[in-house]
Structures are given as structure tokens and as C-alpha cells.
Swiss-Prot record:
Keyword vocabulary terms for this entry: Endonuclease, Hydrolase, Nuclease, RNA-binding, Toxin-antitoxin system
Pfam families, A to Z: PemK_toxin
GO molecular function: DNA binding; RNA binding; RNA endonuclease activity
Similarity remark: Belongs to the PemK/MazF family.
Organism of provenance: Staphylococcus epidermidis
Record text on subunit structure and interactions: Forms a complex with MazE which is no longer active as an endoribonuclease.
InterPro entries tied to this protein: PemK-like, Plasmid_toxin/cell-grow_inhib
Purpose of the protein: Toxic component of a type II toxin-antitoxin (TA) system. Ribosome-independent, sequence-specific endoribonuclease that cleaves mRNA, thus inhibiting protein synthesis and inducing bacterial stasis. It cuts between the first and nucleotides of 5'-UACAU-3' in single-stranded RNA. Neutralized by coexpression with cognate antitoxin MazE.
Protein name stated in the entry: Endoribonuclease MazF
GO BP term (any one): rRNA catabolic process
Gene: mazF
E.C. code: 3.1.-.-
């Protein structure tokens, strides 16, 4: 079963503009109820094109700890919904502490805790 925090290889093509594409690792960020019942899954792209977080929506993951080819970065500003058929193989899963970092970066990316601009 697909679980939140799992890292899979996924085929992200076709893409447009600045979207991450090709076959690459992604982390599952959708909740486990959705993962169980939905034909789709919400993921964040992972890149090895940079190995250090550049902005607050980036989370670093170490190649040795997570069995990746290179030190990589989860791009929480690059989230998308995929059909589960795009998932190829499970590579690893993220630790609870790493998922807390992912959640914090998602909060920033989606502005989940920033409702000041909605007040009248």
C-alpha cells in the first residue's frame, strides 16, 4: 500500500514550463485515507540538481540515509496530483522527523498558517 512519506520513482512527463519532469523520485504527501481509496496520489518532486535547500519550501534528504544516488532536495513548491499508474517503484520512506520538515515546508508553500490577509 502507498503511504504518506513513501518515496517512489514516478513518470512526471509530459510537463510544461518550469515543472519538474521525466522519471524521478517523488515523495507521497497525500494522507493515507486518500492513498488507500483514490486512484490518484498527491506528490512533491525530488531533484538531485541541487543538494542544498535554497528556499523555505525545500527539504534536504541525504543519499546515504535514504538510499538515493545523490543528496537531493524535496521541492514542496512543486506538488502535483498523479494517477497511481505513474508510480514505478518504491525506493524508500522518509523518517518521522523528515516528514515534520516536509509538513513545515508545505505550510509555507500553501500558506496554511497565514490567514492575516483574509481579515477585514
Amino acid at each position: 500500500m502507498i503511504r504518506r512519506g513513501d518515496v517512489y520513482l514516478a513518470d512526471l512527463s509530459p510537463v510544461q514550463g518550469s515543472e519538474q519532469g521525466g522519471v524521478r523520485p517523488v515523495v507521497i504527501i497525500q494522507n493515507d485515507t486518500g492513498n488507500k481509496y483514490s486512484p490518484t496520489v498527491i506528490v512533491a518532486a525530488i531533484t538531485d540538481g541541487i543538494n542544498k535547500a535554497k528556499i523555505p519550501t525545500h527539504v534536504e534528504i541525504e543519499k546515504k540515509k535514504y538510499k538515493l544516488d545523490k543528496d537531493s532536495v524535496i521541492l514542496l513548491e512543486q506538488i502535483r496530483t498523479l494517477d497511481k499508474k505513474r508510480l514505478k517503484e518504491k525506493l524508500t520512506f522518509l523518517s518521522e522527523s523528515k516528514m515534520i520538515e516536509v509538513d513545515n515546508a508545505l505550510d509555507i508553500s500553501l500558506g496554511l498558517n497565514n490567514f492575516d490577509h483574509h481579515k477585514s
